């Protein structure tokens, strides 16, 4: 399993004092308030400040004090170590643990691997790449079992729900 988990992607600078604008990839943006340290490119960084905009988080990182410094971080990911990650509810998983899983139907037919998770308004959708590309809704009526330790997901046969 991944040692570090992405909690957001740096999408732009904010202001002229080195703040960065982050698109959160966590469903609980309030966790950023308690974030004292994170990782960017495997290097630990100290978080000095946090504020919110609709759908975005603005962070101030120690040592990043100019717009030029902040610009160099654009398109990088803010990550936390797994042991410092938020505790998940039952039947909830980190994206890093889902992406790469092999998907099978209940008849043990291999359908492909999860390449990406698409966030929609109502539920996530797993983008499966294999012999055919598939979009699988991440809902209980379709997903039978998720085993992140063995990187295996079982779904109902396509003809049942498609």
From Swiss-Prot:
What Gene Ontology terms describe what this protein does at the molecular function level? ribosome binding
Q: Where are the transmembrane segments?
A: none
Cellular component GO terms held in the UniProt record? cytoplasm; ribosome
Q: Which Gene3D superfamilies does the protein's record reference?
A: PRC-barrel domain, RimM
Kindly give the HAMAP family that the UniProt entry links to this protein: Ribosome_mat_RimM
| Subunit structure, as described in the record | Binds ribosomal protein uS19.
Q: This chain belongs to which protein, by name?
A: Ribosome maturation factor RimM
């Amino acid at each position: 399993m991944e040692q570090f988990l992405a909690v957001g992607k740096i999408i732009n600078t904010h202001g002229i004092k080195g703040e960065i604008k982050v698109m959160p990839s966590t469903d609980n943006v309030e966790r950023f308030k308690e974030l004292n340290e994170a990782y960017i490119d495997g290097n630990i960084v100290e978080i000095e400040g946090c504020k919110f905009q609709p759908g975005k988080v603005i962070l101030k990182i120690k040592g990043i004090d100019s717009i030029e410094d902040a610009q160099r971080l654009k398109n990088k990911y803010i990550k936390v170590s797994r042991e410092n990650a938020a505790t998940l509810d039952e039947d909830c998983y980190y994206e890093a643990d889902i992406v790469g899983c092999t998907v099978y139907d209940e008849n043990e037919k291999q359908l492909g691997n999860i390449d990406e998770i698409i966030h929609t308004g109502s539920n996530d959708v797993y983008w499966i790449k294999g012999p055919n590309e598939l979009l699988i809704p991440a809902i209980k009526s379709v997903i039978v079992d998720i085993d992140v330790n063995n990187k295996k997901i079982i779904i109902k046969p396509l003809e049942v729900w498609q």
